[in-house]
Amino acid sequence: MSLRKRSAQTQMWESPVMSQGKQSLLELPLKESPPKDSGLKAVPSTHTLYVSHLNPQFSVPVLACLLRDTLERLELPVARGQIEVVRRPRNTYALVQVAAPKAVLASLPWRLQMALEEQLILKELTARGKELVLSEALESLHHREQEDSGPSPSHSPGPSPGPSPGLRHPPLPQLADPSPIWGSAGRRQISQNRPSGVRSDSAIVHHKILGQEQLFQGAFLGSETRNMEFKRGSGEYLSLAFKHHVRRYVCAFLNSEGGSLLVGVEDSGLVQGIHCSHRDEDRTRLLVDSILQGFKPQVFPDAYTLTFIPVISTTTTSTPLKVLRLTVHTPKAQGEPQLYETDQGEVFLRRDGSIQGPLSVGAIQDWCRQKWAMELGKLEEKVKVLTLEKEQLQQQLRQRQPLSCSCCVL
């Protein structure tokens, strides 16, 4: 009787990757068809997404940045605090907490396949010789970790492929809890790493850093806004992910009201800085100029500014710490709406603090209609003002009394 109970419990930890026939037989008696008028299909709920086969050559912050950009391309925006990258000898994977309806998660596999065919997924994110795998298999995480780390020494050898009766799988309360525990842990780590006694008189006001052109490590610059984006930029960021972010954010800022990309600042707004020598500055300037020269319409040098702000730290380092600030100025008003595209022919927009794109043909057409509708509304408003002024002038002319003429005969 105990063996049957344990075998029933271990079946809950088996990998969800099985044949469709077997899966349907297991799910049919457990699932009940919801009522047609329930209307709960589109309600978002918190899920944990399992992303495997990540490139182990890159550091954890770089993988988190690339994975965040990839999920945005799949129309699934997440915050960096909701991504936890785990490195294993045989597999590097990530756990991502997302708030999305079930239908959106169910469509992720074919959307990922379409994105791979259209080359929208960054090749650097996936390990060499493997394909990116997205799944919602919380129960199979422990099983997959055992496969990656090898067989357990307590597992009795035998020809039977099934699980051992004496093998017990510990529960995973941290994965079943939908609360964003990674964000609170990250905030505690930030407060511990902040240098003591560090103060800064610098702050971001109207997209400019006031005070001296220097920042203190641990200073708080505020929160991200529609026109302000922060990137931590540690590890191989400048040589790998920075070029992709230049294309995305500069194109989005050009197609909106401008903005700034700050590298060396955490998402929480704390200044950390990046190790950047004079040679790295020259390489970064050449990289930015070469990318923006391929934009269409042409982006002139006065449309953006690239600066490196020194960061004062309590610890001494061989390479100076700096914050990279790439500012795109507000585009000048043109006779007709302009839509910028990158050197790779992609179009991005900035909406509600997130990047939308690359846009499809239909989305670009909708953008053009909205822009022309806005321009038409401005022209109609000007016509109304001019018409009102004309009526007021005509009314003033009517109210004037005619001059009386009198003749005097001498």
Curated annotation (Swiss-Prot):
Coiled-coil spans in chain: 370-401
Pro residues composition bias: residue spans: 154-173
Alphabetical keyword list: ATP-binding, Coiled coil, Nucleotide-binding
Binding site for ATP: G264, V265, E266, D267, S268, G269, L270, V271
InterPro entries associated with the record: Schlafen (IPR029684), Schlafen_AlbA_2_dom (IPR007421), Schlafen_AlbA_2_dom_sf (IPR038461)
GO MF annotations, alphabetized: ATP binding
Sequence segments annotated as region (Disordered): 1-20, 141-199
Sequence ranges of Polar residues compositional bias: 8-20
Positions of disulphide bridges: none
Similarity comment: family membership: Belongs to the Schlafen family. Subgroup I subfamily.
Protein name: Schlafen-like protein 1
Source organism (scientific name): Mus musculus
